[in-house]
Regions:
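Short alpha-helices
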Residues: 4-71, 208
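Hydrophobic helix-and-loop "lid/oligomerization" segment in the mid-to-C-terminal part
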Residues: 54-227
Length: 227
């Protein structure tokens, strides 16, 4: 069960339910529970609600009527204290180290912002920082890169109506790895033959070059996010 594009290895599964048009896999799970008239306990409702809330940014991006229906039906079943603890968790100092690196390395090319984290221990941090940097004034697309356990990790966010993040991710990562996503969000992975700094820098340069060419920004001089 997933809401991302079908992967090659997924096609070999005996049973598959993949709906790329949905904003969250939790919405699909909710429909299964509803169809079987399963009573949804408070903790499960809270978990499913948070999944939809975070994936769609409170129905602000990549949502469907099914996502909205699940969101609205689950909301009154939630435990607000647990939900608050999930949405406002305590974070280790290393978490803020990654944010610091992202801000320092971020470069602006017109309406696009690109940042690199290099070595990370959790691939989700790339997406979190990409979400955060979408708040920069004048920025319509953010792409983040990192290296985690032998793989290059990419995350893309966009508010530009004419840019489909999933299609753009597939274009820039073609021949290097796998990727895809939705209209406003996308992710990708690149298997790294070498993890030394020079290889990571070379990969970053290639991906940035492809992205800027695809966006028509290859002649734009970059400027740092933080002067």
């Amino acid at each position: 069960i997933d809401h991302h594009q079908m992967k090659e290895r997924t096609q070999a599964s005996r049973w598959v339910d993949v709906r790329p048009e949905y904003g969250a896999s939790a919405s699909i799970l909710f429909e299964y529970l509803q169809s079987q008239e399963v009573k949804i306990a408070t903790k499960l409702a809270t978990i499913l609600f948070y999944a939809i809330k975070s994936e769609t940014e409170d129905l602000g991006r990549d949502w469907t009527k099914s996502d909205r229906d699940a969101y609205l039906k689950l909301m009154p079943l939630c435990n607000n204290r647990i939900l608050h603890e999930i949405t406002r968790p305590k974070s280790s100092r290393i978490y803020f180290k990654y944010f610091n690196a992202g801000l320092k390395n971020a470069k602006i090319y017109g309406n696009a912002l690109i940042f690199t984290l290099y070595d990370i221990d959790n691939p989700e941090i790339v997406a979190e920082i990409a979400d955060f940097l979408m708040r920069v004034e004048g920025i319509e697309i953010v792409v983040g890169l990192g290296h985690c356990h032998g793989e290059g990790v990419l995350s893309m966010r966009t508010s530009h109506l004419e840019t489909h993040a999933g299609s753009l991710m597939q274009e820039i990562i073609k021949g290097l790895g796998t990727g895809g996503g939705h209209s406003m969000t996308a992710g990708g992975q690149v298997h790294l033959e070498s993890t030394d700094q020079a290889a990571l820098v070379a990969l970053e340069a290639e991906l940035v070059s492809r992205l800027l060419q695809a966006l028509g920004l290859d002649l734009v001089e970059p400027e740092p996010l933080v002067p």
